[in-house]
Amino acid sequence: MKIAVGCDHIVTYEKIAVVDYLKTQGHEIIDCGTYDNVRTHYPIFGKKVGEAVASGEAELGVVICGTGVGITNAVNKVPGIRSALVRDMTSAIYSKEELNANVIGFGGKIIGGLLMNDIIDAFLAAEYKPTEENKKWIEKMDSLQHASQDQNNPHFFDEFLEKWDRGEYHD
């Protein structure tokens, strides 16, 4: 399976471990970054993963930031993405079987690496089980998404990166 993976600078090592694990399981990885611990902003990498999945370049995605909250919210803003922030297998399986989630999010500083791998395995193995009811839920959720042309601008996040550079954000 082709899987897009992305993170912010706080959890680069955790992302590398996930990428390495997924490769040992035979998956093809699109590593959307970040690649080091240089301060950056999680929406950039959530957007990259979301776009890879929504375009069909990747089948599914994994996003990781310190708590998982920010990057999961960011990836959910990409039209066509249904992402779930999870910390257990039950939630991961539910998100796929009932809501047809195509991206899974983690707090890399909240959850351990071995558990994260187990949850990813459960998510990848789960299959969407369409029903009339969950089709309606998904249709409703998808109708809430509206693409903004501003998002196509490669400088969309520049104002936030400039604030990072000035030290206005703290980890």
UniProtKB/Swiss-Prot annotation:
GO terms for molecular function: galactose-6-phosphate isomerase activity; ribose-5-phosphate isomerase activity. The keyword Ribosomal protein does not apply. Its EC number is 5.3.1.26. It catalyses: aldehydo-D-galactose 6-phosphate = keto-D-tagatose 6-phosphate. Pathway: Carbohydrate metabolism; D-galactose 6-phosphate degradation; D-tagatose 6-phosphate from D-galactose 6-phosphate: step 1/1. Keywords: Isomerase, Lactose metabolism. Pfam families: LacAB_rpiB. GO terms for biological process: D-allose catabolic process; galactose catabolic process; lactose catabolic process via tagatose-6-phosphate; pentose-phosphate shunt, non-oxidative branch. It comes from the Bacteria. InterPro entries: LacB (IPR004784), RpiB_LacA_LacB (IPR003500), RpiB_LacA_LacB_sf (IPR036569). PANTHER family: DNA DAMAGE-REPAIR_TOLERATION PROTEIN DRT102, RIBOSE-5-PHOSPHATE ISOMERASE B. Heteromultimeric protein consisting of LacA and LacB. Belongs to the LacAB/RpiB family. NCBIfam families: PRK05571.1, PRK08622.1, rpiB_lacA_lacB. This is Galactose-6-phosphate isomerase subunit LacB 2. It comes from Streptococcus pyogenes serotype M3 (strain ATCC BAA-595 / MGAS315). The lineage of its organism: Bacteria, Bacillati, Bacillota, Bacilli, Lactobacillales.
